[in-house]
């Protein structure tokens, strides 16, 4: 990453990806209350989508290689599928 993006763009990626984990932890603790559970999972999904946007920018601007981008994109999509499974099937998580 160039100097001007080293902290800005990487910080956005770091913060949005960590937010996915933090919101997932909160949602799981609130799983007894279906609306809270789904609400927090919706935040997870939004943060995961934001992470994907920053990864797309990183690739398009030439900061990461095609291989790294593809690997991270596939992982991001898998996380999104799992989050959406939880949103659509809350009863399977102790709700």
Segments (PLM) and residue ranges:
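Amphipathic alpha-helical assembly/interaction segments
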Residues: 1-95
């Amino acid at each position: 990453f160039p100097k001007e993006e080293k902290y800005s763009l990487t910080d956005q990626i770091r913060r949005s990806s960590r937010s996915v984990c933090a919101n997932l932890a909160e949602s799981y603790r609130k799983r007894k209350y279906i609306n809270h559970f789904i609400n927090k999972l919706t935040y997870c999904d939004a943060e995961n989508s934001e992470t994907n946007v920053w990864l797309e920018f990183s690739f398009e601007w030439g900061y990461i290689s095609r291989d790294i981008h593809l690997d991270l994109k596939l992982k991001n999509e898998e996380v999104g599928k799992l989050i959406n499974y939880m949103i659509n099937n809350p009863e399977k998580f102790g709700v």
